[in-house]
Amino acid sequence: MNEIIPSIDISFGKAVKRIRGVRGTGLVLGNPIELANKLYNEGYSRIHVVDLDAAEGVGNNEMYIKEICKIGFDWIQVGGGIRDVEKAKRLISLDVNALIFSTIVFTNFNLFYNIVREIGNNRVIVSIDYDDTKRVLISGWKERSMEIIDGIKKVNELELLGIILTYVTNEGTVKGIDYSVKDYAKLIRGVKEYAGGVSSDSDITFLKNVGFDYIIVGMAFYLNKIRGTNVV
């Protein structure tokens, strides 16, 4: 399924899948490099990697990202705690194809724009994280910012590579996607990706039909609830 992008979230050297981002919940999947190799050998050509420790300011897992980049994936996108030009350049130098930004876009736009200028628009994806209030979540999903539509408009102005819509309410729960996302998909310029709550093949079919290019999968994927997946 070429539209599926498996996610590997890394915390303290382990691949994990949290429930709504809460530390200590969900699954511990083991060595992230070994997991990435399994995914590659299963035929997945794209991968979504998040450094949870860097995002939370309690460390970084770049050494694992560096090794994952050597495996041979066609596409690697990385997010989590990228808050300065130097780190952005360092990750790109590892052959990461695109970097993912979220909070900084809405809290420090000048810094974000400087990073974009340094690494190029075509290497930047913005994750618009949101919940049932339909407002953008920032600062570790603890605060709410502007409405989703306004967030999309703000990002569209920069003509970046694309946008991920991340439905935090059901993230890691396998409880299903946000079906109202169809109203936002048509507004996005560039590559359209979705994450959060994907629980079945029918969810994936719906997202494809409303215009998403790629679907990022996590908990349901590793619980083998999606057709054709049997990785762990």
Swiss-Prot record:
<comment type="similarity">
    <text>Belongs to the HisA/HisF family.</text>
</comment>
<keyword id="KW-0413">Isomerase</keyword>
<feature type="active site" description="Proton acceptor">
    <location>
        <position position="9"/>
    </location>
</feature>
<keyword id="KW-0368">Histidine biosynthesis</keyword>
<dbReference type="GO" id="GO:0000105">
    <property type="term" value="P:L-histidine biosynthetic process"/>
</dbReference>
<dbReference type="InterPro" id="IPR013785">
    <property type="entry name" value="Aldolase_TIM"/>
</dbReference>
<dbReference type="GO" id="GO:0003949">
    <property type="term" value="F:1-(5-phosphoribosyl)-5-[(5-phosphoribosylamino)methylideneamino]imidazole-4-carboxamide isomerase activity"/>
</dbReference>
<protein>
    <recommendedName>
        <fullName>1-(5-phosphoribosyl)-5-[(5-phosphoribosylamino)methylideneamino] imidazole-4-carboxamide isomerase</fullName>
        <ecNumber>5.3.1.16</ecNumber>
    </recommendedName>
</protein>
<comment type="pathway">
    <text>Amino-acid biosynthesis; L-histidine biosynthesis; L-histidine from 5-phospho-alpha-D-ribose 1-diphosphate: step 4/9.</text>
</comment>
<dbReference type="Pfam" id="PF00977">
    <property type="entry name" value="His_biosynth"/>
</dbReference>
<feature type="active site" description="Proton donor">
    <location>
        <position position="129"/>
    </location>
</feature>
<dbReference type="InterPro" id="IPR023016">
    <property type="entry name" value="Isoase_HisA-like_bact"/>
</dbReference>
<keyword id="KW-0963">Cytoplasm</keyword>
<keyword id="KW-0028">Amino-acid biosynthesis</keyword>
<dbReference type="InterPro" id="IPR011060">
    <property type="entry name" value="RibuloseP-bd_barrel"/>
</dbReference>
<dbReference type="InterPro" id="IPR006062">
    <property type="entry name" value="His_biosynth"/>
</dbReference>
<dbReference type="GO" id="GO:0005737">
    <property type="term" value="C:cytoplasm"/>
</dbReference>
<dbReference type="InterPro" id="IPR044524">
    <property type="entry name" value="Isoase_HisA-like"/>
</dbReference>
